[in-house]
Amino acid sequence: MGQVLPLVTRQGDRIAIVSGLRTPFARQATAFHGIPAVDLGKMVVSELLARSEIPPAAIEQLVFGQVVQMPEAPNIAREIVLGTGMSVHTDAYSVSRACATSFQAVANVAESLMAGTIRAGIAGGADSSSVLPIGVSKKLARVLVDVNKARTLGQRLKLFSRLRLHDLLPVPPAVAEYSTGLRMGDTAEQMAKTYGITREQQDALAHRSHQRAAQAWSEGKLTNEVMTAYVPPYKAPLSEDNNIRGNSTLADYARLRPAFDRKHGTVTAANSTPLTDGAAAVIMMTESRAKELGLTPLGYLRSYAFTAIDVWQDMLLGPAWSTPLALDRAGLTLADLTLIDMHEAFAAQTLANVQLLGSERFARDVLGRAHATGEVDDSKFNVLGGSIAYGHPFAATGARMITQTLHELRRRGGGFGLVTACAAGGLGAAMVLEAE
């Protein structure tokens, strides 16, 4: 086991997560169509503060993330502060770590708390797949810059004459890795082939995810951590996630064709997480500050770890790399955990990471560790479903997972929980949480 790194302040205070909240998650171009991420972020932070009854002035820092950034609001964190009635003196900055963005936001606030520069802060993230920064071609972009410098009408017309019709077409946001040109689904297909993950196994995990998420909603387990959203044109509120298949049957998944490798693939739209809109946030503070304010924390941040691997082959192995580090830093083993919540970007990616956590060979030959991290107990794993069912607004998923896991730990009488995710660029994130 590696070095234990206690997450405490200089006074010995633990890092408390006192409350968390999210919007319902909505499939692309449905309930939140036309609502930018910054508005979703304002919505959730406003409601989170109202429910917590914490004076806004008590929040000294807000760290927020957005993966699909909009040029008109590049610092989403500061816009949220200015748009929610918080003190204008509240420090605010934005972060981005692909699908692990709100993991990073939480880590940053934790570091500020440990350094003693703040005593309370908010961390979270928001993304919209329905409001996207549609760009222009490189040639048109260059001409527009040159036109701005041109002095005469003739010079401007000459510049525009260089353009062809195809140069005027809009350019949607890239869906592939900048460095490799590979889409996330291509990597999921790689992993399915490398680790022998069958189509049947992927479909079964997706079905399980929807079943458990639907059950969590029907049993009222998510009611207190998901707000009701009212958005223009205000025809109907959204109070639950709209991607979950309440009547999921395994036979339905077999009907879909592969989405990436269309001839020989096994990754489909149904066993992958969909493009989604939503926002989530958590309030964090030192343990002593929570006591001063009369607050009972949901739980505590015990440890965290971030990792990075090569992007060309099987790059979505972040959980298999980051989990053992986070456990070492918490002074725990996988067997000590009450719950394990892994981000389901794709069923293939999820199953590959589960497989490698239990692999002695991977631990020895790749991680350089004496023993495997451990076999994942199915009764502890994604017990309320995962991202395949809930959806995945990139920057919001980590905060959703943290809030959801802490609530479930408390329902079970406390214990330790792991939340972990892969991310674009070969990145990985893992956090160990504790509830009493």
From Swiss-Prot:
The protein's annotated pathway: Lipid metabolism; fatty acid beta-oxidation
GO biological process: fatty acid beta-oxidation
Keyword Cytoplasm annotated: yes
Function: Catalyzes the final step of fatty acid oxidation in which acetyl-CoA is released and the CoA ester of a fatty acid two carbons shorter is formed.
Subcellular location: Cytoplasm
Catalytic activity: an acyl-CoA + acetyl-CoA = a 3-oxoacyl-CoA + CoA
Alphabetical list of Gene3D superfamilies matching this protein: 3.40.47.10
Domain of life: Bacteria
InterPro entries tied to this protein: Ac-CoA_C-AcTrfase_FadI, Thiolase, Thiolase-like, Thiolase_acyl_enz_int_AS, Thiolase_AS, Thiolase_C, Thiolase_CS, Thiolase_N
One Pfam family per UniProt: Thiolase_N
Organism of provenance: Escherichia fergusonii (strain ATCC 35469 / DSM 13698 / CCUG 18766 / IAM 14443 / JCM 21226 / LMG 7866 / NBRC 102419 / NCTC 12128 / CDC 0568-73)
Name of the protein this chain belongs to: 3-ketoacyl-CoA thiolase
Residue positions of the active site: 99 (acyl-thioester intermediate), 392 (proton acceptor), 422 (proton acceptor)
Keywords, comma-separated and alphabetical: Acyltransferase, Cytoplasm, Fatty acid metabolism, Lipid degradation, Lipid metabolism, Transferase
Enzyme nomenclature, EC number: 2.3.1.16
Cellular component, GO, one term: cytosol
Subunit-level organization: Heterotetramer of two alpha chains (FadJ) and two beta chains (FadI).
Protein family: Belongs to the thiolase-like superfamily. Thiolase family.
HAMAP family per UniProt: FadI
CDD domains linked: thiolase
One annotated GO molecular function: acetyl-CoA C-acyltransferase activity
